[in-house]
Amino acid sequence: MSKMKTCKSAKKRYAFTSKGKIKYKKQNLRHILTKKSSKRRRKLGKSGLVSSFEVKRIKTLLPYA
């Protein structure tokens, strides 16, 4: 049987924590920042955790992670 392939885009977007949770970088922090409040920009700067119902789907994309 052949090896399972890793989805390269998912590999670049997601990272696993030591406890097994999946974290990602939030969107909307690249450009057009003047109209966004400092509170919103500060919250977007922190990494987010993937919700529990999406974890199974992401783990199928990353079989060796």
From Swiss-Prot:
Pfam family, one: Ribosomal_L35p
A cellular component term, taken from the record's GO annotations: cytosolic large ribosomal subunit
Domain of life the protein comes from: Bacteria
Protein name as annotated: Large ribosomal subunit protein bL35
Gene3D superfamilies given in the database record: 4.10.410.60
Keyword Iron: no
Organism: Borrelia turicatae (strain 91E135)
GO MF entries: structural constituent of ribosome
Cytoplasm in keyword set: no
Keywords tagged on the record: Ribonucleoprotein, Ribosomal protein
HAMAP family with a match to the protein in the record: Ribosomal_bL35
Protein family membership: Belongs to the bacterial ribosomal protein bL35 family.
PANTHER family in UniProt: 54S RIBOSOMAL PROTEIN BL35M, LARGE RIBOSOMAL SUBUNIT PROTEIN BL35M
GO biological process: translation
